Amino acid sequence: LPQLRSALAKVERVYALQPLDGAAAPEVRAASRYEGIMPRALLALKNAGRTDLLPLLGEGLARSVYELLRAHRVELQSVPGSSISSVGTSAAPVEVLLIPAPSSAQSVRRRGYAPANLLVQEAARQLNKRLPASVRVRAVDVIGYVPRGRRGSGASLSSRVGAFLLSASETKNEQKSLGAVGRAERMHGALRVMEPALCTGRVSVICDDVVTTGATASEMVRVLQESGSRVLGVCAVAAVPKKAQT
């Protein structure tokens, strides 16, 4: 555990997202690089039932979110009705939605839980103890996979055919063999906001355990923005160094 705590000691700004449409990439923050002890720790949480690691890994995610919110404190002041921008203290605090990357139903059944959801819930618990009263965070699981027969709207024919043939878990497995552009193409149209009304006009932060090429996060940004959410950025426990992204 001391070695893991040391690996999570510094939050870095990561340049990982490369949207295909040329839009500005959202800011990415991670508490560690995905190397050394981090792969073992995160895989232990995901595949070995090591939920006892949640407090420490959740602390890493919480620090990433905290640094992102601090970097955007001026932007948060402009949220209508926020107590940050009000002269008095009667206005409600700004509520930031922490939105976990989705897990496939198959992986949840296999593990018995969704690791990203647990990490986000733990991070939210820790953040609400640390943040000023003018800012609150809430874990909200609103992103899901589009049924495979409806995927790929607006994507290339090959992407639509591939998306149709792959389940959510198969899509994730297939992505491991693709480069950054291939992963982004495969993810386009694969996600949806299950409760758009919950996100409209709200500030959100996308959260995951690991950011690699950013294909999943970029697609989450796209669908959240289409639902009217203001996405501040992407936060993760760890990020794969660029030289390791293939």
What is each residue range found by the language model?
Residues 1-246:
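Glycine-rich phosphate/pyrophosphate-handling loop used in enzymes and phosphotransfer proteins
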